[in-house]
Amino acid sequence: MAKLSKRMRVIREKVDGTKEYSINEAIALLKELATAKFVESVDVAVNLGIDARKSDQNVRGATVLPHGTGRDVRVAVFTQGANAEAAKAAGAELVGMDDLADLVKKGEMNFDVVIASPDAMRVVGQLGQILGPRGLMPNPKVGTVTPNVAEAVKNAKAGQVRYRNDKNGIIHTTLGKVSFDEVQLKENLESLLVALKKAKPSSAKGIFIKKVSISTTMGAGVAVDQASLEAQG
């Protein structure tokens, strides 16, 4: 059996895997154990009461976290005309049509989010095999195919997170950085859970949000007692 690192031993001693912690305790624990030499992200895993094998129970969408994600997001927009000027004014780093598609085909993808106006999808559609595997393909369900590209750019810059359940019915996304204060992380989590509850499929029965766990980039997951969120919020 591989020998545990000192860091992992400390984490195992501090985190009780059988316990659900109040949100305040969970965040304090993450901060205490975040000893990496870089500012770690705080991520969340939400187990949903869905059957992920059924397409009508899959959950996908996007929401803007009230305190952002702590990341500088570079945005590329496929559009033209007045929309192109609006996208640039909103802060998009790259704006274009065929010229932007050529950059993507060359592998020059110095961006984190791709947005497209509906009329640009004839160009973007040719890039599916490149953008799709990277999770960058624009989609109307998450607001990245839209006639209002300026608003989409502003949302991306403001800290919008996209979510989609995996094959096990779990949502994985980010809540911010471990340098955020307790209130910021708590409010970001509550905002995400509100968005998920609104996205509950009508065919999903029983308890929808079954388990919530938060973790840092290099840390273990800490289960959160949902009652502590409701009691404090």
From Swiss-Prot:
Q: Output the PROSITE patterns linked to this UniProt entry.
A: RIBOSOMAL_L1 (PS01199)
Cellular component per GO?
cytosolic large ribosomal subunit
CDD domains the UniProt entry points to = Ribosomal_L1
Disulphide bridges: none
Q: Which GO terms describe its biological process?
A: regulation of translation; translation
Question: What keywords were assigned to this record?
Answer: Repressor, Ribonucleoprotein, Ribosomal protein, RNA-binding, rRNA-binding, Translation regulation, tRNA-binding
Instruction: State any single GO MF term.
Output: tRNA binding
Alphabetical list of NCBIfam families matching this protein = rplA_bact
Q: How does it assemble?
A: Part of the 50S ribosomal subunit.
The entry's family comment says: Belongs to the universal ribosomal protein uL1 family.
Biological function: Binds directly to 23S rRNA. The L1 stalk is quite mobile in the ribosome, and is involved in E site tRNA release. Protein L1 is also a translational repressor protein, it controls the translation of the L11 operon by binding to its mRNA.
Q: Give the protein's recorded name.
A: Large ribosomal subunit protein uL1
Per the UniProt record, the source organism is: Aeromonas salmonicida (strain A449)
